[in-house]
A protein has these predicted regions:
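Flavin-dependent oxidoreductases
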Residues: 1-91, 102, 107-114, 192-201, ...
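A short alpha-helix-loop-beta-strand transition element characteristic
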Residues: 8-12, 170-176, 237-239
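Generic structural signal for residues positioned in beta-strands
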Residues: 18-20, 47, 60, 135, ...
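Short, glycine-/Ser/Thr-/acidic-enriched flexible segments
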Residues: 26, 53, 66, 141, ...
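Short, basic and Ser/Thr-rich N-terminal targeting/leader segments
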Residues: 41-44, 130, 241-245
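C-terminal catalytic lobe of FAD-dependent flavoproteins
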Residues: 43, 71-74, 83-208
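Short, well-ordered strand-loop elements centered on a beta-strand within folded domains, enriched
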Residues: 55-63, 144-147, 259-263
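Glycine/proline-enriched, intrinsically flexible loops and inter-domain linkers
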Residues: 186, 191, 195-270
Length: 270
């Protein structure tokens, strides 16, 4: 739809394996909506959750591939050879998740006891952006074209509210910078840039934990200043970039000045 309207949408679909086990005997006829709480298995990049009595009382095991995430070309969404019932439900290859699934059986043996429901299991699709944030707001390219994309379950209600507030009031109650679709420059909407950054972000959805300012490795040196080579000679630390421009945060050539100024730098105990 974005392509037809002339609106670039900087995101990549990502396959998300969803395996179902059960049903849970405890859920049959139970008054409680849920029997078990959600378990997040950080070390295995996976989670286990109770789907609820109204959804068959199954246990859902979801996995985030942290080594070779399987991005899906937008043109391939809806490929009848790869989908089952819905464009966002793709066939699951059990071999792709065999190793983490074995670990899950050790951590949560109830999965093995209940048994795998093959017919209900599939690869879902998630949306991942170049900076792992959602895309909310009016398109900079086409007036009146609004987006609320790359929104995951836990963020759905809040993102919907922000989008509605933007439409009705022209502003929101919170700072929209990290969600606003307009935060991306044209170069950051190019397909290869989006794909490489989305792949990198997909590797760290659950594990390993990364610092919010962790520098990106992919799609670097797109733009450099005329004095970039000189900055490198001075030992520039190009740990980050701004709008695709390389920017040095510090210079090794200034290291000798620590003796003079270190005493003026406050000590942070925490």
């Amino acid at each position: 739809m974005g392509k037809k309207a002339g609106v670039p949408v900087p995101l990549m679909p990502l396959e998300h394996p969803l395996l179902f086990f059960g049903p849970l005997p405890e859920a049959q006829g139970a008054e409680d909506f849920l029997v078990y709480p959600l378990l997040r298995d950080q070390g295995n990049s996976a989670y286990v959750r109770d789907t609820g009595r109204l959804h068959g009382g199954m246990l859902e095991w979801g996995y985030y591939e942290d080594k070779n995430p399987r991005l899906v070309d937008p043109e391939d969404i809806g490929n009848p050879e790869k989908t089952m019932g819905s464009d966002s439900m793709r066939y699951l290859d059990l071999e792709e998740v065999a190793e983490p699934l074995e670990k899950a059986f050790e951590t949560t043996p109830i999965l093995n006891e209940l048994g795998w429901d093959e017919k209900s299991s599939f690869n879902g699709l998630l949306s991942v952006t170049p900076d792992a944030g959602s895309l909310i707001g009016e398109s900079p390219e086409v007036r009146g074209f609004w987006l609320c994309e790359a929104v995951w379950v836990k963020d759905g209600p809040g993102c919907a509210r922000l989008c509605a507030e933007s439409m009705v009031n022209g502003k929101t109650q919170v700072d929209m910078h990290s969600f606003d679709i307009a935060r991306f420059y044209p170069e950051q909407k190019e397909k290869e840039f989006v794909k490489s950054r989305a792949f990198e972000n997909s590797q760290t959805i659950y594990t390993p934990a990364v610092h919010p300012r962790e520098p990106y490795i992919s799609s670097r040196e797109k733009y450099v200043s005329p004095f970039y080579e000189r900055e490198k000679e001075l030992g520039g630390f190009f740990d980050n970039e701004v709008a695709c421009w390389e920017r040095a945060l510090a210079y090794k050539s200034n290291e000798q000045k620590l003796d003079k100024y270190l005493k003026d730098i406050p000590v942070r105990e925490n």
